[in-house]
Amino acid sequence: MELDTTHISVLLNEAVDGLAITDDGCYIDCTFGRGGHSSVILSKLSDNGRLIAIDRDPTAITAAEKFKDDKRFLIEHQGFAALAEIAEKHELTGKVDGILLDLGVSSPQLDEAERGFSFMKDGPLDMRMDTSKGQTAAEWLAVADVEDITWVLRTFGEEKHAWRIANAIVDTREETPLTRTSQLAKLIKTTAPQREIKKHPATRSFQAIRMYINSELDQIEKALVASLDVLAEGGRLVVISFHSLEDRLVKQFMKKHSQGKKVPRGLPISEIELNKGKKLSLVGRRLKPSQTEVEENVRSRSSVLRVAERLERNTD
């Protein structure tokens, strides 16, 4: 199968600007994808600069071969939850000038029916980011009980009809195994009323199952926490989210670590003491794609970019 390289990086310039790149700096692209952001980062680095990319999708590792002769670049085939371990392996803990996280599913993953991410194309019900390991969506749906399926649909998809859909899945699999995306999409469409005119009834359920299969929120949380140790003082953390669950997690993390100690009013405490515990400084406001970008790439419409800067460690 020919590798699909048609992915358009969302908020490309805004994300790279947020990194505030210095030509001899060290950066980590936690979601290489097809290398859109990495290409621009490399174009801004001198021979002394360095870029480490991370991706758990085998097709992304293949796509990274275009940089194999660039001594400034290397890629690690892992999930970005391993950020701390990767930085330690390369002796970069506390030395990285910028970390980029571009969350969600890439266009090639959605467009390739065999990956099983899309309800718009028939394919095997897989949904794994890393196809070399782990449980597929079909395998999980074959054994999960109604309560577990309901919890996943509600927690990761905010699906109001979760119980109804979960019951339909369990009832259906007793007669016919659910192994194809088209089967699941049709089942959901006939089970749950359409909530939004422009949104397929299966949208939230597919998102929820994908996020559960890939432990996406857990991966994000681990990477965010690791970034505090991996970043150098003044290093930038840039995160692009694509739905409210991701963005809420990022927003709360950045807010938490950009605030100092909470103390009662009126106490005679110095500014240094008040700032103790602050690890991040928020950089600007959240950014959304321009109307032009949305028109050129409709998948960018829900994206949100947030930036924070690592503070001096004597305030930790």
Curated annotation (Swiss-Prot):
The keyword rRNA processing applies. S-adenosyl-L-methionine binds at residues 35-37, 55, 80, 102, 109. One of its GO terms (biological process) is rRNA base methylation. One of its GO terms (molecular function) is rRNA (cytosine-N4-)-methyltransferase activity. It catalyses: cytidine(1402) in 16S rRNA + S-adenosyl-L-methionine = N(4)-methylcytidine(1402) in 16S rRNA + S-adenosyl-L-homocysteine + H(+). Keywords: Cytoplasm, Methyltransferase, rRNA processing, S-adenosyl-L-methionine, Transferase. Its EC number is 2.1.1.199. Its main location: cytoplasm. It comes from the Bacteria. One of its GO terms (cellular component) is cytoplasm. The keyword ATP-binding does not apply. It is an enzyme of class 2 (transferase). It is found in: Cytoplasm. Specifically methylates the N4 position of cytidine in position 1402 (C1402) of 16S rRNA. Belongs to the methyltransferase superfamily. RsmH family. This is Ribosomal RNA small subunit methyltransferase H. The lineage of its organism: Bacteria, Pseudomonadati, Pseudomonadota, Gammaproteobacteria, Alteromonadales. The gene is rsmH.
